[in-house]
């Protein structure tokens, strides 16, 4: 019976992790039988198909790398997906799929899964996929981003600012666009997201965003 539940969860993740451009994506709900299972079981059954066995991410499936984020940030985002803080906007198809794919996670599940991701899986460094002027990007980053995300882009949990170094560059771009477009940071309980949404327009155009991301890609991640 457990094997059947695992296979169903794997199938669900394969369907749910598509990109935002899918016309009418099927949206499965996480199998309730996985709630309360060991972190590795949840990870391998529900997450690996999209995020990769090492948490390295998969651009084709819209799944970012995860292992350079802090356990605190991962826990908060998973909690937001479960509670409806994230994935609630009608135009956020990817967020909606993610929210439903983890719908049955409990607070304990989230805590052990976040710990597993950040301690048991190897730190990965995604492949660079975007082009930009890292020198220009450094100026923008130092003036606009470093106060919260740190001069080394390794984040600051006290400020709710995630690590950026070591995160998939295409996902950084997608997330930034989400804040600009109002897909993220609009829920009344998303305090940190609201801060980011207010600050996002500070970068004038997409070239500037790419330059900042190009600079971030030159920085060493939190975990080697």
Regions found by a protein language model. Give the residues of each.
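Sec-dependent signal peptide recognition
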Residues: 2-8
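Bacterial signal peptide processing site
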Residues: 17-21
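The feature marks the first
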Residues: 27, 33-40, 44-83
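Short loop/beta submotifs within extracellular cysteine-rich repeat domains
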Residues: 6, 49, 55-58, 73-75, ...
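Sequence/structural segment immediately N-terminal to covalent heme-attachment motifs in c-type
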Residues: 31-54, 129-154
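General marker for long, soluble alpha-helical cores
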Residues: 25-28, 32-33, 37, 43, ...
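Axial heme c-ligation environment in periplasmic c-type cytochrome domains
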Residues: 58-65, 81-110, 127, 131, ...
């Amino acid at each position: 019976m457990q094997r059947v539940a695992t296979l169903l969860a794997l199938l669900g993740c394969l369907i749910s992790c598509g990109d935002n451009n899918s016309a009418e994506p099927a949206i499965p709900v996480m199998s309730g039988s996985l709630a309360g299972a060991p972190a590795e079981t949840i990870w391998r059954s529900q997450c690996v198909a999209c995020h990769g066995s090492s948490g390295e991410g998969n651009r084709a499936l819209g799944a970012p790398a995860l292992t350079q984020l802090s356990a605190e940030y991962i826990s908060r985002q998973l909690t937001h997906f479960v509670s409806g803080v994230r994935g609630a906007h009608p135009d956020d198809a990817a967020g909606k799929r993610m929210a439903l794919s983890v719908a049955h996670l409990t607070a304990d599940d989230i805590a052990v899964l976040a710990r597993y991701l950040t301690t048991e899986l190897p730190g990965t460094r995604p492949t660079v996929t975007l082009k930009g002027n890292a020198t220009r990007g450094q100026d923008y980053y130092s003036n606009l981003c470093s106060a919260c995300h740190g001069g080394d882009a390794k984040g600051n949990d006290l400020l709710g600012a995630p690590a950026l170094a070591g995160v998939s560059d295409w996902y950084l771009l997608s997330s930034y666009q989400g804040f600009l477009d109002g897909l993220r940071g609009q829920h009344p309980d998303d305090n940190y997201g609201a801060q980011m949404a207010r600050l996002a327009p500070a970068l004038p155009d997409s070239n500037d965003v790419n330059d900042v991301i190009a600079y971030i890609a030159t920085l060493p991640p939190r975990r080697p």
